[in-house]
């Protein structure tokens, strides 16, 4: 994709928001010119960012800020920074880098080590989650199991997604319902009452999966 875009002079912009909590991102390996992330997806503050591989791009793109005296990234920012949130952003990354207490070295080194272990743990737990949902009555998983991040959306024909999410919340399970999605709309998901979306966090356990399935079973 990167080579095809660059051959015609286009930029490759990768929205890595959904992958960031689960995969170690490398803008060079991806071949992306711009990488988009949002810290709230890994438990950080409500801060989104565009990471540019080449700082010279700042001068090539049309500015958003009307102040034409600005240079660099300030050309694409409006208003003051939320410094408390930026401090929380750093803290959230340090938290991920410290999940494995044996990790040493720079922040990037520790993050690589911790994310490697986290990925293996969550892939095993994801396998358990998918199998548990597949065996639950009235649950239809959306999408394929291969190459999936630990986020799962499903429908329950005859049960509105909002009702299912409310039952999960009442049982201590956090879930989203009816997330706006053209993909879901194209699949006709709204016709089945909408989709429920759940995701695994570093602290998720098999017990959480069991609690999820028990709560869904109570809707049958």
Q: Which ranges hold each PLM region?
A:
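Pyridoxal 5′-phosphate
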Residues: 1-220
């Amino acid at each position: 994709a990167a080579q095809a875009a660059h051959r015609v002079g286009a930029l490759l912009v990768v929205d890595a928001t959904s992958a960031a909590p689960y995969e170690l991102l490398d803008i060079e390996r991806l071949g992306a010119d711009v990488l988009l992330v949002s810290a709230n997806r890994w438990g950080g503050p409500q801060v989104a960012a565009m990471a540019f591989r080449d700082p010279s791009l700042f001068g090539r793109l049309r500015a958003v800020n009307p102040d034409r005296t600005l240079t660099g990234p300030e050309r694409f920012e409006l208003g003051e920074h939320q410094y408390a949130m930026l401090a929380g952003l750093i803290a959230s990354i340090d938290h991920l880098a410290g999940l494995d207490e044996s990790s040493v070295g720079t922040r990037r080194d520790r993050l690589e080590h911790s994310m490697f272990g986290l990925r293996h743990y969550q892939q095993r737990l994801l396998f358990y989650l998918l199998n548990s949902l597949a065996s639950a009555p009235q649950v239809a998983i959306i999408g394929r199991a291969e190459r999936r991040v630990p986020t799962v959306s499903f429908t329950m024909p005859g049960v509105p997604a909002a009702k299912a999410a409310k039952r999960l919340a009442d049982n201590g399970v956090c879930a989203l319902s009816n997330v706006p999605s053209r993909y879901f709309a194209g699949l006709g998901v709204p016709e089945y009452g909408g989709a429920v979306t759940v995701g695994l966090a570093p602290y998720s356990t098999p017990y959480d999966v069991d609690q999820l399935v028990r709560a869904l079973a109570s809707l049958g």
